[in-house]
Amino acid sequence: MASAVARLDKLKLINPPAWLPSNTMFEGWTGSVAYGASNDASDMDVVGFAMPPKDILFPHLAGEISGFGNQIQRFDQYQQHHVLDKSSGKEYDIVIYNIVKFFQLTMDNNPNMVDNLFLPRRCVLHSTEMYEHIRDNRKLFLHKGAYHKFRGYSLSQMSKINKGSNR
């Protein structure tokens, strides 16, 4: 499958930074689609990561000196919610992370980020050689702290279910 960000950008349904569609390294279906719990009314959750241009990733290359003068706007993530594609009848929620933030969250064993490394192939919308290398080595991200992170995440999700919350 092709990149959802590139397709929605081409349809002018989203307005990401100009460099984002061509620098996205990975996109995947998450949420109900990934867990096989979606239906025709489900929104389509797309999560991924991108490699910003080097002057955004390393602001000193653009002449920025931290704390002096005009500061370059940082890129941590691009997100847009409730994007309605009338041609497909689907609504999208999109979050594309800066590769640095993605790695930080993944190395912290954030359950939502680790999930992206273990998505079923059918849920990988767009991947590059870089993502495939990361995916091939995904178990290296896991450590003993994962137990506590996933346990806490599971308990919070059960609490939401018991309270009848959807989010």
Language-model regions: role of each:
Residues Y35-Q71, D76-Q80:
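Catalytic metal-binding acidic patch
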Residues M1-G31:
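Helical scaffold of the NTase/Pol beta-like nucleotidyltransferase catalytic core
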Residues M1-A2, P53-K54, N110, T128:
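Alpha-helix initiation/capping motif
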Residues P16, S38-A41, F58-H60, M113-N116, ...:
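General "foldedness" signal
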Residues N70-R167:
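Conserved NTP/Mg2+-binding pocket subregion across the NTase superfamily
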Residues G28, V47, F103:
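Residues in well-ordered beta-strands of folded domains
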Residues K12, D43, N137-R138:
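Short, flexible coil/linker elements and helix-boundary hinge sites characteristic
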